[in-house]
Amino acid sequence: MKFQVIAAVLLIAFCLCVVVTARMELQDVEDVENGFQKRRSCIDTIPQSRCTAFQCKHSMKYRLSFCRKTCGTC
């Protein structure tokens, strides 16, 4: 009887460890995906004072097809 109780407790502990590990891995995947979306998101327009030809050519908004040019009036 004592062995069955110990086995049941160990089984429950193992199941909890599996559930916690799965949740942590899922959270890591979500964090990576959210970070990727944040990196791909468009930045606000660059102020006219900082607007250079290099920034127009290499800005995030210019390179991504779904974004408008950052420096529209360079």
Curated annotation (Swiss-Prot):
The keyword Ion transport does not apply. The record marks 46, 50, 59-60, 62, 66 as: Important residue for binding Kv1.3/KCNA3. Keywords: Cleavage on pair of basic residues, Disulfide bond, Ion channel impairing toxin, Nematocyst, Neurotoxin, Potassium channel impairing toxin, Secreted, Signal, Toxin, Voltage-gated potassium channel impairing toxin. One of its GO terms (cellular component) is nematocyst. InterPro entries: ShKT_dom. Disulfide bonds join 42-74, 51-67, 56-71. Residues 42-74 form the ShKT domain. Its main location: secreted. Coiled coil: none annotated. Residues 23-39 form a propeptide. It is found in: Secreted; Nematocyst. GO terms for molecular function: potassium channel regulator activity; toxin activity. The keyword Secreted applies. Residues 1-22 form the signal peptide. The record marks 61 as: Key residue for binding both Kv1.2/KCNA2 and Kv1.3/KCNA3 (occludes the channel pore like a cork in a bottle). Belongs to the sea anemone type 1 potassium channel toxin family. Type 1a subfamily. Inhibits voltage-gated potassium channels (Kv) with higher potency for Kv1.1/KCNA1 and Kv1.3/KCNA3. This is Kappa-stichotoxin-Shd5a.
